[in-house]
Amino acid sequence: MTRKARRCLGHLFLSLGIVYLRIGGFSSVVALGASIICNKIPGLAPRQRAICQSRPDAIIVIGEGSQMGLDECQFQFRNGRWNCSALGERTVFGKELKVGSREAAFTYAIIAAGVAHAITAACTQGNLSDCGCDKEKQGQYHRDEGWKWGGCSADIRYGIGFAKVFVDAREIKQNARTLMNLHNNEAGRKILEENMKLECKCHGVSGSCTTKTCWTTLPQFRELGYVLKDKYNEAVHVEPVRASRNKRPTFLKIKKPLSYRKPMDTDLVYIEKSPNYCEEDPVTGSVGTQGRACNKTAPQASGCDLMCCGRGYNTHQYARVWQCNCKFHWCCYVKCNTCSERTEMYTCK
């Protein structure tokens, strides 16, 4: 582990008041005043604080899963006006967009998937109490397919169930945005479940495959990022439906006249159109594109014309000098030339 990574983990544990101990390949977590510490973590709902106090080891994993989701979000949108950033108060799930847009839909889905992925992985690795390998995928023989369960299958049902209880608990209000958030949370988890992998190993004499054992594994999170980015591009505009006047919304339907069709379980849904993300706006949570690096010649979203929203861009020139064309001379010294290069960088005004 790099020094920077160790420092980041240290800050995380200290901020939560948690001592992380690794004993014999397993991890145990000792909370130092969990009640006090959990009450200081910003943005937690009462149910989430209760889970934090009872399962501080799981809170560390939840934080790692949330960060994994945010990192993937930033990767997928690194070349767009919106780069997975937002204004507002920081929570355990990062800063949140205030409008119910496509971007908010993606954020909720990728974080929900990240938390479920991290919990499931921690169970498989033996780093969490009360969970482990999937007990239902052990020893059963699938005669038609010629293999049986073996190894340690990832218990995705436990991971999704635990993540659902924690992540969904922040949705306290009963309004259209809550319905949207809960739908996108579920979509992220369901897409994770649908992309689980089956790995197998052959057993037999001289490389034959007389018997085969198989187990389920988690997909690479980057794969989920690409799947969810496609879902973002095809996100469905929805609106709330109320059972009667003056009642809270009960479900979401696709926003089309004379239609009550509900979105698919794995659709990302949004209730408001996206802002253009050109300017900083506390109302929407947009941080704007001022100061963002752009590509002068690119025609797509990362190009300066689109990224800078017509405001123009600044040009920064840099000189890089290094030793090059080095040769060894007998005996015994090395002679190098000095090479230099001028580069330009462009940032939005």
Swiss-Prot record:
The keyword Signal applies. Disulfide bonds join 73-84, 123-131, 133-152, 200-214, 202-209, 278-309, 294-304, 308-348, 324-339, 326-336, 331-332. InterPro entries: Wnt, Wnt7, Wnt_C, Wnt_CS. GO terms for biological process: angiogenesis; animal organ morphogenesis; apoptotic process; asymmetric protein localization involved in cell fate determination; canonical Wnt signaling pathway; cartilage condensation; cartilage development; cell proliferation in forebrain. A lipid is attached at residue 206 (O-palmitoleoyl serine). Residues 1-31 form the signal peptide. It comes from the Eukaryota. Palmitoleoylation is required for efficient binding to frizzled receptors. Depalmitoleoylation leads to Wnt signaling pathway inhibition. Residues 238-266 are annotated as: Disordered linker. Keywords: Developmental protein, Disulfide bond, Extracellular matrix, Glycoprotein, Lipoprotein, Secreted, Signal, Wnt signaling pathway. Its main location: secreted. GO terms for molecular function: cytokine activity; frizzled binding; signaling receptor binding. One of its GO terms (cellular component) is extracellular matrix. It is linked to Defects in Wnt7a cause the postaxial hemimelia (px) phenotype that is characterized by limb patterning defects accompanied by Mullerian duct-associated sterility in both sexes. Ligand for members of the frizzled family of seven transmembrane receptors that functions in the canonical Wnt/beta-catenin signaling pathway. Plays an important role in embryonic development, including dorsal versus ventral patterning during limb development, skeleton development and urogenital tract development. Required for central nervous system (CNS) angiogenesis and blood-brain barrier regulation. Required for normal, sexually dimorphic development of the Mullerian ducts, and for normal fertility in both sexes. Belongs to the Wnt family. The intrinsically disordered linker region is required for recognition by RECK in brain endothelial cells. This is Protein Wnt-7a.
